[in-house]
From Swiss-Prot:
Organism from which the protein derives: Rhizobium meliloti (strain 1021) (Ensifer meliloti)
Lineage of source species: Bacteria, Pseudomonadati, Pseudomonadota, Alphaproteobacteria, Hyphomicrobiales
Miscellaneous remark of the record: There are at least three nodD genes in R.meliloti. They differ in their specificity of interaction with different flavonoids and, consequently, contribute to the nodulation of various plant host species to different extents.
Keyword entries, A-Z: Activator, DNA-binding, Nodulation, Plasmid, Repressor, Transcription, Transcription regulation
Annotated PROSITE patterns: HTH_LYSR (PS50931)
Domain of life: Bacteria
Family: Belongs to the LysR transcriptional regulatory family.
Protein name as annotated: Nodulation protein D 2
CDD domains per UniProt: PBP2_NodD (cd08462)
HTH lysR-type domain location: 6-63
Annotated function: NodD regulates the expression of the nodABCFE genes which encode other nodulation proteins. NodD is also a negative regulator of its own expression. Binds flavonoids as inducers.
DNA-binding segment(s): 23-42
């Protein structure tokens, strides 16, 4: 189909090229052969009167003109998809929808595995692609490249709708044989002890308690840094190190990795896990159905109310 001389299929190719930045991957994304994608680039260059891309090794480097076109092309394709194509009511038992979700290792273990178990029964054709925290998840959200972010509410964008899942307490833990934890844990002792800390994404975003300390000008003695909370419990036994991790994670590992919970000298540490979705997907029946599943699972009694420290 052409619109004012432009083959609209070329916009799909341009969007894939801007997303993947590699010729072969972009061709695979839109189910074209590599020669066909090369031909599409040539036609795009002719139509727009611009090179659009140059090659640097195997990577496609967009020109300023291509960078300027990309957001409008993506928005146009999303509007077509959501307004024309994706409005059929979803039938969970027959759906083969695939959802792309950014969430932490912690949420995968303590929450999302329940969602997967439920949908294996109710919607066996539905599949998921779980993604790590990216350098810029908000750009993926804006472009509609992910269906949901599941993150602490504090770190969510104000430009897209969101909903609370549950509140979570952060607790200080260490090895049960760590004699330094027998007495009161003063602020001075807390700061001087070796810590195992989680940082997230390629940019190593700090966890909530680390962000809180940095905001007040304090710096812990961090001896180990890991890319997620779930790697911390196995690294504490038989050491004198401590860590701040979600309470539900302590309970998840309590049968295999016993940990001692100690009262930390910081203000009470809580955060709210929430789910966010692209504004463009707000009325998409499939997105509405999946977010209802997430909210229903979060409303179960074990996820509501204050989490007991006992």
């Amino acid at each position: 189909m052409r619109f004012r001389g432009l083959d609209l299929n070329l916009l799909v190719a341009l969007d894939a090229l801007m997303t993947e930045r590699k010729l072969t991957a972009a061709a695979r994304r839109v189910k074209l052969s590599q020669p066909a994608m090369s031909a599409a680039i040539a036609r795009l260059r002719t139509y727009f009167g611009d090179e659009l891309f140059s090659m640097q090794g195997r990577e496609l480097i967009p020109t300023p003109r291509a960078e300027a076109l990309a957001p409008a092309v993506r928005d146009a394709l999303l509007h077509i998809q959501l307004s024309v194509i994706a409005w059929d009511p979803i039938n969970p038992a027959q759906s083969d929808r695939r959802f792309r979700i950014i969430l932490s290792d912690f949420m995968t273990l303590v929450f999302f595995e329940r969602v997967v178990e439920r949908l294996a029964r109710e919607a066996p054709g539905v599949s998921f692609e779980l993604l790590p925290l990216d350098d810029d998840p908000y750009e993926l959200l804006r472009r509609g490249d992910v269906d949901f972010l599941v993150l602490p509410d504090l770190f969510m964008s104000s430009a897209h709708p969101k909903a609370k899942l549950f509140a979570e307490a952060l607790v200080c833990v260490g090895c049960p044989t760590n004699e330094q934890l027998l007495g009161e844990l003063s602020f001075e002792k807390y700061m001087s002890m070796g810590h195992v800390a989680a940082q997230f994404g390629r940019a190593l975003k700090p966890s909530f308690e680390q962000w809180l300390l940095l905001e007040h000008g304090f710096k812990r003695r961090v001896e180990l840094v890991v890319p997620g909370f779930t790697l911390i419990p196995p690294l504490l036994p038989h050491t004198n190190r401590i860590a701040i991790i979600p309470l539900r994670l302590v309970k998840y590992f309590e049968q295999t990795i016993p940990l001692r919970i100690v009262k930390h000298p910081l203000p009470p540490l809580w955060f709210t896990e929430a789910v966010q979705w692209p504004a463009l997907h707000n009325k998409d029946p499939g997105n509405i159905w999946m977010r209802e599943i997430l909210l229903q699972e979060a409303s179960r009694s074990e996820f509501q109310g204050e989490t007991s420290l006992e």
